[in-house]
Amino acid sequence: AAAKNGSPPQSAGASVRTFTPLYFLVEPVDTLSVRGSSVILNCSAYSEPSPNIEWKKDGTFLNLVSDDRRQLLPDGSLFISNVVHSKHNKPDEGFYQCVATVDNLGTIVSRTAKLAVAGLPRFTSQPEPSSIYVGNSGILNCEVNADLVPFVRWEQNRQPLLLDDRIVKLPSGTLVISNATEGDEGLYRCIVESGGPPKFSDEAELKVLQESEEMLDLVFLMRPSSMIKVIGQSAVLPCVASGLPAPVIRWMKNEDVLDTESSGRLALLAGGSLEISDVTEDDAGTYFCVADNGNKTIEAQAELTVQVPPEFLKQPANIYARESMDIVFECEVTGKPAPTVKWVKNGDVVIPSDYFKIVKEHNLQVLGLVKSDEGFYQCIAENDVGNAQAGAQLIILEHAPATTGPLPSAPRDVVASLVSTRFIKLTWRTPASDPHGDNLTYSVFYTKEGVARERVENTSQPGEMQVTIQNLMPATVYIFKVMAQNKHGSGESSAPLRVETQPEVQLPGPAPNIRAYATSPTSITVTWETPLSGNGEIQNYKLYYMEKGTDKEQDVDVSSHSYTINGLKKYTEYSFRVVAYNKHGPGVSTQDVAVRTLSDVPSAAPQNLSLEVRNSKSIVIHWQPPSSATQNGQITGYKIRYRKASRKSDVTETVVTGTQLSQLIEGLDRGTEYNFRVAALTVNGTGPATDWLSAETFESDLDESRVPEVPSSLHVRPLVTSIVVSWTPPENQNIVVRGYAIGYGIGSPHAQTIKVDYKQRYYTIENLDPSSHYVITLKAFNNVGEGIPLYESAVTRPHTDTSEVDLFVINAPYTPVPDPTPMMPPVGVQASILSHDTIRITWADNSLPKHQKITDSRYYTVRWKTNIPANTKYKNANATTLSYLVTGLKPNTLYEFSVMVTKGRRSSTWSMTAHGATFELVPTSPPKDVTVVSKEGKPRTIIVNWQPPSEANGKITGYIIYYSTDVNAEIHDWVIEPVVGNRLTHQIQELTLDTPYYFKIQARNSKGMGPMSEAVQFRTPKADSSDKMPNDQALGSAGKGGRLPDLGSDYKPPMSGSNSPHGSPTSPLDSNMLLVIIVSIGVITIVVVVIIAVFCTRRTTSHQKKKRAACKSVNGSHKYKGNCKDVKPPDLWIHHERLELKPIDKSPDPNPVMTDTPIPRNSQDITPVDNSMDSNIHQRRNSYRGHESEDSMSTLAGRRGMRPKMMMPFDSQPPQQSVRNTPSTDTMPASSSQTCCTDHQDPEGATSSSYLASSQEEDSGQSLPTAHVRPSHPLKSFAVPAIPPPGPPIYDPALPSTPLLSQQALNHHLHSVKTASIGTLGRSRPPMPVVVPSAPEVQEATRMLEDSESSYEPDELTKEMAHLEGLMKDLNAITTA
């Protein structure tokens, strides 16, 4: 593969050239000059050696040696003196380009710069005499050539005119005078000075008139004009208005008012023109100039277009390549308008061909590299406002020299196993020199016959002996050679193989000039011409057409060049394409052409017509447009016709716009019934109207300035699980009532509230509890608020009451007689999405009574379902209002809803359906079917497969894979692998061999993360003979891109011993045997110590026990308050798990000596992995623990330990730091050491449960870490042997003992120490730091034997020995795990 911007592929003995910098420091820019002046076009380039600079004008090199007016400056710039420019001779104006060349290296070209020369001054408009009122605005025109505008200035009375905030010159040259004064009166003229003699315009007199009380019409003196500006320039939108009173100018952009005072880039110039500084793309749009003088408002608009010069998003990169390879120079540009791109090689334009192709819009692809392709390639982008260039260098590498090792011979039996029109498949056998060929790769070199440019295609993996060559030309001869490579290099090439691709079948090309046009609302005519490449006689054509938005395509056979399709839908868009047929079959299809049938009058009436009586003189009419299939065109309006019901001949008609779906009809008579109907309009005419719908205005206008009064009555009828509530409206009928609010609940009416329509007179409260006392309240409400409530109570019937017939409802005197007309279904059903499980359904009912005060017993049934799965059943609910809240829906699911009205025993049909899709929700189920398998041939790589969650609740946008070797670890300690949402499999590489891993997967969507899957265990396979490696290599692989998450930030590579990179590997068997021997020695030592301790404690005297029990804590928190002589002294060897060290009550020495104890560190230092041991292990960590330490220990145990370690390197580094201060026991008096306990102070703020014990340190450099507080009691806490450094096991009884440290203490001081897993007891147990215990000191042991007496009863001793036996079983389990 080609190398980009980096070091090239290196081979032994190969010398590789480096990229040579060659670039422009300064490039020429567009310049404007005048006749006779001098101009400099800057250019400077850098390279080593210095480049040679030349110039091109209009694509042709300039001969500067013999040119008197043009010369090359030392830095490479072009100097032109005495610019020549006339009507028939313009030798200096044009496009210039700087060319930099380095011999034997390459050439680059600069951007193109335009040199424009201002022409002779010509006035297109001149100032004219005018008058202006004091305080008003006026203009004086002076328009010249666009390139001469910068050279225009004005004079007043033959004196230079000074410009200020009140008098400005616009970019066009026009002079604007605002807020005119008498001093502005005079003669004005404009002058153009462009290098030659100045040119004067005609003089015009400006008269200033005094203010007048007459009204002067408001007019624009100058309107804004559309313009195009380049980003970063300034734009001035002119706008000057005049009138009496004087107008005020304001500006708007896209209907938003512009704030010209606070904006830093917007300014209002004299007269009202708008100036925009430093134009950006966001400034583009339509601007409105609005002039207002209080009597009249006028406006004018202009479009501002902002253009952006080309800018590179991605520039070409330098490339190393070898001959026959394919390369791609990438180039990505942006600009407005979109720039065009061309490529230049060493200053010459690259012409696209078979081997130089433009791919992916702007990239240059070079196929089959040859030595002459080497050089500099430049991407040149250009649009209307500028151009830019960026380049890169291509270096063709020499083939690597042959090595001394054996090279493969030529591949055998090279054949073309498959030959098609545009591809050839080659196969071969392995070389005779390497019959297996598993590690050989192959390169296929091929070229078109007669062409020197050769290309290469490599096999995808070692051992593969076939390749398919794509993108060939039909009926073309190609020459193929195959070459094998091994680790020493490329071998011999096979004999050339000559293969010719198959010729393509001669099929017709696309039919040109296909056109389609509508001839009527239901027909379209399509025409086309004969294909240019017919390849024989055209037999017939097939015309395909399809309605836009559908996927069903229809076709018809045609023998001519045109066809008219009838029976199409009105005002519907169709797409058409044509395929020509000859004797070989169908040819190439044409591009689709789209056309819409003509519009027609609507074929259906508007939908869901409803009437709302607003007051005594107005009615609001509502409707919905006809269905889209019946509109037959763009709805341009609606025609509303209405009349009094008593006089059918008197019809009033009004027309509204097509976007309006309601209309207020005013000026009606009081208490009068009116009929209404609506029809839709298109440009073709009026469609059918709806049926007449009636409504009656109120007799009088009702008051809504206050809340309604209390309802006149409230009645309740209790049933078993429901209560029927009925009421009558307030007595005062002159106050508007919008509805009623019913509150109810057991013992209180505020538990739930239901609102019903103002026309309703009863309601059934459902889903109540039997035999329960409910309090019910009723309030009328309107837009002002709720009125005074009316209270009632009722007790629902018990379950045993089977009388469910409600005679009160059946014989209700207020139930009206059913309307003999059939029930009409509800209309205007709409679904409003509220949340992920709630949708509100609303509708209208056209079958309500004509007047507003009559009520009946009708209710509505809402049904809904989803179509996934297809056999889902409908769900139903009843409602007595015109809306219903559907809850309990599934997230991200499309539902359909319909409504039916029921009154008495009659029901309507179901309404038209409405659809609504609930919002998304986070996944509520984890990914399922999680499986883990090992990748074949790669034991360190596994493949995780899964299926999406069953309850995704939305589109899955991604997954997160968690994995760890400790299933109980906190989730933030697991390693994560993100996966995109469309993937259901993922590879994880560089895992540790023969190690159990646990995997969890979590899905996410746009709302968040879902739950995790259950942990799936997978043990990586053991390494076979080919995969085995030294221990240091296995460990080192994690640091080279591996994914071992548990090493943590404290990991340090091995530095010495057997774990060093150069050490010999240690087999797992030797390591395990060494561990067993060490632990066994530790167990034997413990047994000996325990026997001695038991013997000593049996001789402890009663007097000595009382003396030890008298030890109190410093804060006086000792909880054993009995007589000291009743306290049995603790035997630390037996009561190990129930005692703790007591704090110092009083120190006999007022100035205890404190010493710093440095801790040497070697490979025996071991850090505990986790603090998740069970409770009895927690108790055994501290030999002295009583009731005082339970709280602190529980807090300590809850803290998180260090992250678990997956691998077990041992560290033999020298000490890194000193340990905290500890009291020295060597300098304390003997009496204090016998009667006092020591309180340990933790500098890290740890609890008092972290106690350390120490014994005398040996002088040997191999001593274990000793950071201990020596307890006054002569007995030591239990300790477990530690793992010694690599090498033969050594047991030194003189080594100091190290008790089991608490998790918190170890976390503070042993940061960089590595751990080794000891084993488990059938459950998760962390590795424990272990050391070899030492026997008690001789003096202490002698004192203990002298003071002790036998005081334990046989049964007590039996219990203690049983407990000791439990400890020994735990130790045995550790050694065998």
Curated annotation (Swiss-Prot):
Which keywords has UniProt assigned to this entry? Cell adhesion, Cell membrane, Disulfide bond, Glycoprotein, Immunoglobulin domain, Membrane, Phosphoprotein, Repeat, Signal, Transmembrane, Transmembrane helix
Q: Where are the transmembrane segments?
A: 1075-1095
- Topological region Cytoplasmic: 1096-1377
- Which positions form S-S bridges? C43-C98, C142-C190, C239-C289, C331-C379
Kindly list the positions at which Phosphoserine occurs in this protein. Answer: S1147, S1163, S1317, S1348, S1350, S1351
List this protein's GO terms for biological process: axon guidance; cell-cell adhesion; intracellular iron ion homeostasis; multicellular organismal-level iron ion homeostasis; myoblast fusion; negative regulation of axon regeneration; negative regulation of protein secretion; neuron migration
Residues on the membrane's Extracellular side span: 3-1074
Membrane-protein topology? Single-pass type I membrane protein
Question: Which residues fall in a compositionally biased region of kind Basic and acidic residues?
Answer: 1021-1030
Modified residues annotated as Phosphothreonine in this record: T1167, T1320
Q: Does the keyword Repeat apply?
A: yes
A GO molecular function for this record?
A: signaling receptor activity
Q: Gene3D superfamilies in the record, alphabetically?
A: Immunoglobulins
CC per GO annotation: cell surface; glutamatergic synapse; growth cone; intracellular vesicle; membrane; neuronal cell body; plasma membrane; plasma membrane protein complex
> What is the annotated localization of this protein?
Cell membrane
Polar residues biased stretches = 1056-1066, 1160-1176, 1213-1238, 1246-1265
Question: Is NADP set as a keyword in this record?
Answer: no
Instruction: List each copy of the Ig-like C2-type domain by range.
Output: 21-114, 121-206, 198-305, 310-395
Q: Where is the signal peptide?
A: 1-2
Family under the similarity heading: Belongs to the immunoglobulin superfamily. DCC family.
State how it assembles. Interacts with MYO10. Interacts with RGMA and RGMB. Interacts with BMP2, BMP4, BMP6, and BMP7.
Q: What is known of its domains?
A: The Fibronectin repeats 5 and 6 mediate interaction with RGM family molecules.
In terms of PANTHER family, this protein maps to: NEOGENIN, PROTEIN SIDEKICK
Protein's name according to its UniProt entry = Neogenin
Q: Which organism is it from?
A: Rattus norvegicus (Rat)
